[in-house]
Amino acid sequence: RGRDYEVSPILIAPVGKDALVFLNSQKNKVKNVTEQQLQDIYSGKIKNWKELGGEDLVIKAFQRPKNSGSQNLMEKFVMKDVEMMRPPSEWVATEMGELIEKVAAYDNSADAMGYSVYYYARNMKKGDGLQFLQVNGVEPNSDTIRSGDYPYTNPFYIAIRADEPKDSPAYQIYQWVLSMNGQALVNELGYVANEKSDVKISSEDLKKIGLEEKNDTVSGKYFP
């Protein structure tokens, strides 16, 4: 026999935004693509950079592993109901010596295109020769993501029970995350906070909450 449960009202508030961003090499003269062109690239209709005003190079359109955060956003925002083409792959040896096929990692070659989430990509070392592609003429940055002018933005929220006591840890965290200090931490982590904040989070404060000061150098694989 089923039980009757009382459902408590939820207090929910937006914390900030992330976004799906597209990248290619600074060696590539293509700086802007449209939403339709992105869908056509990843469905296999557009195959060469010259179709976008670039060099005569076959587009190496990298993808992310299935069910990763970036891939879920790609399917939701860009592809919608259109099937993606087969991704570039590579064979990797396991610890047991077996070879398995996996989605290839982005290599930033002149013919490459890839995508990631903004919070990760913005903290990558700029000297790696990457550039953000504009979408519909809009560059992904904190201002365009915050305003919603950039098309592929993804808001995230904080939620607690509406009847949570004001002196409870959950309520205090809720209030703090929405404060200027909390919004500064959202920015420090690489996301885009709802509100601009000039507050700086010190490395000592980051360590107090279990976070280390972020490292702007990334080597090896490019995307989460």
PLM feature spans:
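Exported/periplasmic ABC-transporter solute-binding proteins
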Residues: R1-P224
